[in-house]
Amino acid sequence: KVLSRPYLMRRGYWYVGLAHLAYKLLRTGIEVLFYPDFHLQLMSTTVLEPRDVVVCISFSGSTKQILELAELVQSEGSTVVSITNYRRSPLVKHSDILLLTCSSENPFMSGAAASVIAQIAVIDALFIGLAMHNPEHSTKFIQKTADTIKSQKV
């Protein structure tokens, strides 16, 4: 499948992981659309094309809003990549590609560092896989973005 632009969507505390993924993809020259607001995420589904890829992150995989987004994305014929902690979650039914984290949370630790770290580990593995798929392109843009932000250091 030829990738157009990845869209990144999440609910709750998962902003950290998607911001990390947006940063990593941009470093390799992949333009990313990242809408932190749920209404913007909903509206963005109306402009999806079949070659677009949407990354949805939900620890439980059962958040109503992320399920609605994934269902809308699939109805547009786009690919849904889901990152969740539960193989049997409702989100899996709306996923074309499933990436699982391995972490535990309890009611007192919602959004705990352990779950975010597990998520970032999966995101880093995804990033490395994408970068290795086209190393010349990735290396070029990693260097180009490094040169661009180098001027911001004293």
Regions found by a protein language model. Give the residues of each.
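A short, charged, Gly/Pro-tolerant segment at domain boundaries
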Residues: 136-154
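Glycine-rich phosphate-binding loops that contact phosphosugars or nucleotide phosphates
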Residues: 2-121, 125-133
